[in-house]
Amino acid sequence: CKIPRWDLGKFHGVDKELGSSMKSVGEVMAIGRTFEEAIQKGLRMIGQGMHGFVENKELVIADLDKALREPTDKRIFVISKAFRAGYTVDQVHELTKIDCWFLEKLMNIMDTSRELHSFMADGELPMIPVDLLRKAKVQGFSDFQIARALGLEQAMDGEEAILAVRNFRKSAGILPVVKQIDTLAAEYPAQTNYLYLTYSGTANDVRYLGDRKSIVVLGSGAYRIGSSVEFDWCGVQALNTIRQEGYRSVMINYNPETVSTDYDMCDRLYFDAVSYTHLTL
């Protein structure tokens, strides 16, 4: 799932309607085993304060129908608000002309969010069904999104809320696994160092636990105003130095435009988010 990063808010008076003219300054690429997982990961990777398709700060929109008709950089969050307000997939399709397949997948995320909201409690983590928690993680929900949906943010510090969900998730055995990307589309078996994390799996494709000969380099993410290829080149130079010193080099990044995400640049490339949850599992 590739998503452009628009920095239209930094340009005074710019038209925010999207068309054939390129207005993005960068892009991210998210990989998952479900569309729901990939789109939510991608929306977080953009790095503009959004946590996914749901559980964001509410947009103030005077006319939802008009906002749905206009293709802007915030359109996907307008769709989220419309679903929350009770719009159906068919209604949103009629206004946006977006294929119903995509809208059905986004509605799946909204339905799971509503299920989580039904367990909202005051002050402490409710005993939500493990199957629901696993379903949320498979659909790309972050620990923060789950904490916000359960109302934990209102009773405790944000970091405490995230840790409460994280600890419960780990105690239930809900952990991500490392999967290889098949660069040959199953034409024949292939072993690659092109990896990603997913909650849709039961076993790791590579062994990494106890590996003390590897050094991890964190990528700089999507290009944006003030951060471009020069920062990525620092990461590439770090990878080269690590290899020269006899260590295995590991890159974590999610920018498909960069040199550091060429999988021949390092021993293992994790095409995934650079976040606390992903770095510590």
Model-found features: residue ranges?
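Glycine-rich active-site loop/lid that clamps phosphate-bearing ligands
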Residues: C1-N56
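Short helix/loop capping segments that flank catalytic or ligand/cofactor-binding pockets
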Residues: G9-H12, I39-Q40, V54, F144-Q145, ...
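Gly-rich Lys/Arg/Thr-decorated short loops/hinges at beta-loop-alpha junctions or inter-strand turns
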Residues: S20-M22, K57-D63, R114, I215-G226, ...
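Terminal amphipathic helices with adjacent charged low-complexity linkers/tails
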Residues: R33-R75, I79-A85, Q91-I128, L132-P189, ...
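Non-catalytic terminal/interface segments that mediate subunit docking, oligomerization
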Residues: R169-E257
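Short acidic-hydrophobic, aromatic-tinged amphipathic segments that line or gate anion-handling sites
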Residues: L269-S275
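Conserved small/polar residues in nucleotide/adenosyl-binding loops
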Residues: Y276-L281
